[in-house]
């Protein structure tokens, strides 16, 4: 089945009188949509009660959730600390996604900065392998 829906709350969400994320399932149903990407671009900060309401509403309406991990993830940074922090942010995103019943996490690898694409791809690949191992270990 093809799933279509917004990433975050659009202007029409508030224009239609909705105020908070737990109301998203009702809004999506009215719009004929069946997917929603929860935005954590500026950090994984969730309200547990609100997320559980979102999950219940989406499950009741067959709406599939995904979660967008923080934008500041940098899998290809030349700084080891930034790469390790990126793994931590991915783990935090996975924990939040699990809580809300999201089936996917969207992660951008970051830029090449001052290194070649080949070097950046190599670093990103290695960091992603470490993140996947950490996710396996966490479950």
Where are these regions (language model features)?
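N-terminal pre-domain/capping segments
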Residues: 1-92
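Active-site acidic/histidine proton-transfer and metal-coordination neighborhood
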Residues: 59, 76-139
């Amino acid at each position: 089945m093809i799933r279509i829906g917004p990433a975050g709350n659009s202007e029409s969400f508030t224009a239609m009188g909705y105020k908070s994320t737990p109301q998203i399932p009702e809004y999506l149903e009215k719009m004929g949509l069946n997917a929603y990407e929860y935005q954590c671009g500026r950090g994984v900060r969730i309200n547990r009660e609100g997320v559980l309401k979102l999950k219940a509403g989406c499950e009741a309406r067959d709406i599939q959730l995904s979660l967008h991990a923080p934008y500041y993830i940098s899998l290809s940074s030349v700084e080891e600390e930034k790469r390790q922090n990126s793994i931590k942010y991915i783990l935090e995103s996975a924990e939040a996604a699990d809580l809300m019943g999201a089936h996917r996490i969207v992660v951008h690898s970051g830029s090449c900065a001052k290194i070649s694409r080949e070097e950046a791809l190599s670093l990103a690949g290695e960091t992603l392998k470490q993140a996947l191992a950490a996710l396996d270990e966490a479950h």
